[in-house]
Amino acid sequence: NITIEHSIIQNDILLNRRIEEYLSSRCGFYEIYTYPWIDEKYIHAAKIDISKSLKLATPPAPSLAYLRSSLIPGMLEAIAKNLRYYNEFKLFEKAEVYQKGDYRPSSNDEILPVQSNYLTGCIVGKNAKEIFYEAKGVIENMARYCHMENIKLEKIEKPNYADINAYLNVTKDDKIIGSLGLLSVQVMSDSKIKRTNVAIFEINSDK
């Protein structure tokens, strides 16, 4: 006999739809889509150790040789581009990231990078305190609206991109699964993000 069960994948699809609806319809975010290969300068700008990123054998361009291990670099690039036209905006992206690992889905001869689903979002505006607390509220309310398992916001470990005085970690079952913070002055400078403030968050949605 074959038993058909409602799979975890179906639940994931429903959760993703809830998150999209919540961020776009209720919070005023616009969804963006970026390529999996990232401009090297934004990897450095995000203060990510590039040695932990996967390098492509045949990149589409010399500066696009690395696969993203985080969605933050792509979001930095999107912010810099959008600031040419807008002073205030909110963006989000849901996508896979690729990390070095030893993932063998079907045979020992086939070694693939470890792939994880991440969610990132940003609020860009002049008032740093206001956008930080708005982003904090977005995450807190997302858990309730999307029927997600309880997540908490705690100050444990500063993310590399964040200002030393304005960050929080997203935790679940006492484990860090994401972060929220204002971009540091150095990260904004290296990303050519000028005359504004940015609150940004990133969550591993597989955890």
Feature roles, as predicted:
Residues N1-K207:
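Extended beta-strand-rich architecture
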